[in-house]
Amino acid sequence: MDFVITVATAADSWKVVKRAEELGFTYAWFYDTQMLNADPFVAMAAAAVHTRTIQLGTGVLVPSNRLAPVTANCLASLNKLAPGRIHCGIGTGFTARRAMGLGAVKLDDMAEYIRVVQGLLRQEMIEWDYAGQRRTIRFLNPELELINLADAIPFYISAFGPRGKALAARLGTGWIYGVRSAAQSVAQLQVMQQAWREAGRDPGALYAVAQGSGCVLADGEPYDSPRAKAQAGPGAVMVMHDLAEAEERRTLGYRFPDDLQPLFEAFKEIYAQYTPSHAKYLQVHRWHLMRLRPEEEPLATAELIKRLTLTGTKQHLQEEIRALRDAGYAQFAAHIRYGHETMVEEWAEMLAGI
């Protein structure tokens, strides 16, 4: 099993990525959330020149953020700096689009986007639609080797629902899933494996990535300690961010625990007060997956963190991740919270025992 990190992209994310490489992590994924974080391709370029072996990927790229030919060029340019170390995770856009008041990209549009990007990277001549015009495009001078089209760039789709899983299976990409617990994530992997069977593929060939958000607790440390709240709290309240917008947007499909419903009701009251009223998303996604906002602090309880994140002692987390590995996940990715970069050492120490 590959052990990797995911970072909330900063222009200097290369520093934590370099440290992760030194500690034995094999991949680093970078957020593509333009209203909250730095550009992933800028950060990945810096990481490419400061590291030697760690694999670098978009985690995950959102199609509407760039034209498909631009994305193909960005990936190939990075591939020149770090040959064979570049990966493309892609999704329909949760945070990146919600932060601008938009819903997810349509799956058919994402499939077309992937077709164009992959075709260009294979040096094919591609039919491409833009602004109602159909054009034939290709890279014009790959022989000059300004970019690297020789080394393959693997693709992964972040998929929570059945249609997204079916698309990943049809295209034969890797699959990225957000982990809350081993039991829940193993069940989702089984659904994904069945999608591969239905697509005529061998489930054993599926490369499944489990992305986990949480905190490695010291023995006796409570789930709502200041450190645990800072590291795991943003991942827990993210579920409330998603569900609070359920009337306007399709949700990720996470279920809020029935016995914790009073916490969500309290959050909905907070959400109702956000201004401007026509753009509540400007508040609800502020600091999203990076920090707790002051009004969220009382809601990030020990039980919420315990139930909605991958938080626990070393022994507990080792058992959870072994269960993911034994079920067929090929990679576990730990979210390194912005401003808490020492998490990379804490997760490395815990993962060393697996």
Predicted regions located by residue number:
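Acidic (Asp/Glu)-rich catalytic clusters
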Residues: K18-E22, M44-Q55, L75-I86, A169-R170, ...
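Active-site mouth loops of central-metabolism enzymes
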Residues: M1-A11, L61-P69, L149-F160, G214-L217, ...
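Glycine-rich, proline-tolerant flexible connector loops at the mouths of alpha/beta enzymes
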Residues: Y27-H50, V62, F94, V179-R180, ...
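Alpha-helix-loop-beta-strand connector modules within alpha/beta enzyme cores
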Residues: F41-T58, Y113-V116, L120, A348-I354
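Hydrophobic faces of well-ordered beta-strands that scaffold small-molecule active sites
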Residues: M1-V7, A28-F30, Q55-G59, I86-I90, ...
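N-terminal beta1-alpha1-beta2 module of alpha/beta enzyme domains
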Residues: M1-T58, I153
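Conserved, mostly hydrophobic/aromatic
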Residues: G24, A47, L78, V117, ...
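An alpha-helical appendage that flanks or caps ligand/catalytic pockets
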Residues: G103, L107-L144, Q190-A323
